[in-house]
């Protein structure tokens, strides 16, 4: 064990220190030990959401992972076992896109030509390359930031065992009759040509500008036109009908000059007005109901199609409204959900001249190969040239984009498999109410509303690399056939799959036999599973070719990571539901939803009990980070520059996690200077004197009751801190806990306890008081290291290890293996804390007033006045009066009850923000009454929290929050107040000649102490001092000679008039008086 505690340089490199601690954790296997240590409270279950295996970690991941790490470290210290299994999301488009780029494949058809088997082999190789070689990506971020998660045995969504568990879940849902195939209008990603689920769709909305056009459809039986509005001109090619509201009032209007007649909803006549003053251009010539228009034929806009079914006539739809447009909707069944449902009612034809890649087909040669959104402009131009375009505008609205390819989504009629989540929506809503959401409004609002508006889950995907949908169908299967039809079934395990058949070298054989003989290797992916068929009741069943939504993969991780139900049943029962999860706000419609939906579908339980949602990270100006803006923050560069601890602390303390976070380097540096420097300086202060005195905490504890009031106060405050931080952590209020620790470290420990205890450490002998000071400060530092450990694991570990290297009371190998501190109620003295808090507040107020007046703290002043109108307030102040006088450097404290305001003047100002909503039109009259409130009325309002004001016979109750109370300075005095703690203080700013002399002496001491430090003297070294100065300065020195010698450890002082012959540094000014100081180490 070293003989001395290590000291930290003022230029401590946080990055280098963190590297040292990481090495310690690895060498000692500390993370593994934290998982294996005694856990008397059992398992605290945490689920890690799987990142995309080939994704790049960003600063937002540092944010979410800090939250996870803080909570998990805290519960480990609280006596729980907290398994933390990492995971990899390995299926779907992110991997496929990378493989396509590597192989030079441009689209889906290219992949099919290349070969699905070879393509998926490349995908698997890519996945495991990233898993095995992640030191520069996720692994580097995880280790560098101090995030403890088990990356040695992660769950991998493309693993056979994982897929088997997913298949079990799908079969369970299928057997409940909740998986079905249907033909619907679905949102589709045209780039990948695959369906998007509602939760995927929610991830990609953007603000865009689209055309807003009014089109004239000419009726066949007259020269009149029906006016229709649309924001999707490209769909007009597929128009087959116009829908009106059966009971909506429509009008025929005639243009007074041209004679043109248009038909539209009467309540939408305003759309005809192109310019101000055009109202009179049109006149109403007839009115009718929408039902009167039903069945009328019109001329198609384009002549590309000759459908067998009747088309291009007016129909009635109950979805038609007059909230926008013209009250008439153009119907293109292939591209709209309402349109499609209406087409089934009227047997309308479906014109679908757009391929799944979003491009027009050869059916419309004028636009063949053109992307659907790119066709808007040429179509509008054509309609304008043909006289069919009435007006063109631009509209700004939100529109969904592919969350992976960033291209506009197309709503498209196609077959797809669905999970009937609408059947369980009420149950999902009910279970959601049992979850503790942080913040609550996410659970009741964004997430709750999403559940209320639930749509069936579009499950299937027509891609290549993913979990195959384990449904086998007969050749005569058709949409509408259910599990009881005998035409389809689901496979839920490898054992069931082994019952199928496979062809090998032209020979058909049982799959189980083939596997047992080593003729094939099991791979639950395409194309292997597509080779397997079943024979049941004489029918052949082949697998439906689709994959499933990758979000089902990640939502299955609570059980699939354990290969449940095939093994680990007992462990699953202990870890489900999760006690805690945390991710970004965008996951409310992503992972949070899929976890919740699958858990409800299978287990009828929520998947998690507590969730912390983090907001987005923005740049320092509040802008979204993007490569194009050049404002993306590199997490590795930031951690190298500031250290991971500083960024973790900054992300936690600035605001609650769910609020948008501005990443501001200047604020990170400020937290380093404020909090980290206070903690390190407190440690350095301790070891500076402990090394001199050889303190190792080997002596018996000084009893708490025998310690000084200052020691008892800081220990009481420390135990109150433990209780309050623990309470905040149990409520998942991480920011509140962080701020409590920060305030205690800076305000109570560094700026108060240590500063007021300095003289006790300077004492030569190790008496009971000095020993008590050492033991108290050592205890505070050790306890703070524990409280800080979840938030700033590196610096907490560093100080813990360095304290433990010489002395201390804890034997834990690491602070992260130590137990969380428990508040000792017997040490808490609320009254002592309260009066010391008053002393701190008064000190702060007086120092602020000194700064305002330009008077240094070292300049003594005569007195302060404290308002003591409340019962018992004077007695409380008198208990800490000596401390206050010493801190603010005044000679005395006087007390006033000041009910009439003769000494301390108060004024009341109305708070319109609270008055307005409560008093409405009476607010102005009430504000005038508030402005003329007397001092006594204001004091009563402060004491009682409310006051009644007669407003012309009407009694109004004014609350404390309705009034801003300001305190006005009086001549020769400055006044300040802290309303929250009901403290008001006035400072006498007059400086007499006697006070000025005392101020000179104090300033001299400060300069001498600086010179001692610059001369390289030890803190215990005695000195011989020479002061040369002006007569006024020497007079001040003579008057305070004993004080100067005691403070500077001087054994002698020589006072000389100033001339150029004296040794020492150059002449300087001390409070405008010339002075030259010199000192040398004294032998005695």
Curated annotation (Swiss-Prot):
The keyword Metal-binding applies. Keywords: Aminoacyl-tRNA synthetase, ATP-binding, Cytoplasm, Ligase, Metal-binding, Nucleotide-binding, Protein biosynthesis, Zinc. A motif ('HIGH' region) lies at residues 51-61. ATP binds at residue 627. It catalyses: tRNA(Ile) + L-isoleucine + ATP = L-isoleucyl-tRNA(Ile) + AMP + diphosphate. The keyword Zinc applies. GO terms for cellular component: cytoplasm. GO terms for biological process: isoleucyl-tRNA aminoacylation. Its cofactor is Zn(2+). Its EC number is 6.1.1.5. It holds the Pfam family Anticodon_1. Catalyzes the attachment of isoleucine to tRNA(Ile). As IleRS can inadvertently accommodate and process structurally similar amino acids such as valine, to avoid such errors it has two additional distinct tRNA(Ile)-dependent editing activities. One activity is designated as 'pretransfer' editing and involves the hydrolysis of activated Val-AMP. The other activity is designated 'posttransfer' editing and involves deacylation of mischarged Val-tRNA(Ile). IleRS has two distinct active sites: one for aminoacylation and one for editing. The misactivated valine is translocated from the active site to the editing site, which sterically excludes the correctly activated isoleucine. The single editing site contains two valyl binding pockets, one specific for each substrate (Val-AMP or Val-tRNA(Ile)). Belongs to the class-I aminoacyl-tRNA synthetase family. IleS type 2 subfamily. HAMAP family: Ile_tRNA_synth_type2. NCBIfam families: ileS (TIGR00392). Monomer. This is Isoleucine--tRNA ligase. The lineage of its organism: Bacteria, Pseudomonadati, Chlorobiota, Chlorobiia, Chlorobiales.
